[in-house]
């Protein structure tokens, strides 16, 4: 998990909304993700990004909704994901969005 946290940043992210019901049993990974994204070190990578914690008491499924600057949206349902899976998916999408914004092709699509 340390590797996923080391490359975590909010450079191409416009908004992160984390929604969960704290009384459900499957919210630990979503809360860990929120804690990682809300840290001062990560938030300092993009001061214009808003991180919103939407805590509800309705038994809803934990969900992370990420809106990127280019309009791309990443939605992760946290009920069956670990915190490391969520952080690595988030980091890989940020890397892909950064490569798309700079005009480079992602390194995974180098085949002919």
Curated annotation (Swiss-Prot):
Signal peptide annotation: none
Record keywords, A-Z: Mitochondrion, Ribonucleoprotein, Ribosomal protein, Transit peptide
PANTHER family: 39S RIBOSOMAL PROTEIN L53, MITOCHONDRIAL (PTHR33618), LARGE RIBOSOMAL SUBUNIT PROTEIN ML53 (PTHR33618:SF1)
Cellular localization per UniProt: Mitochondrion
InterPro entries per UniProt: mtLSU_mL53, Ribosomal_mL53
Family, as annotated: Belongs to the mitochondrion-specific ribosomal protein mL53 family.
Organism, as annotated: Bos taurus
Name of the protein in question: Large ribosomal subunit protein mL53
Subunit structure: Component of the mitochondrial ribosome large subunit (39S) which comprises a 16S rRNA and about 50 distinct proteins.
Predominant cellular place of this UniProt entry's protein: mitochondrion
Superkingdom, natural source: Eukaryota
GO cellular component: mitochondrial inner membrane; mitochondrial large ribosomal subunit
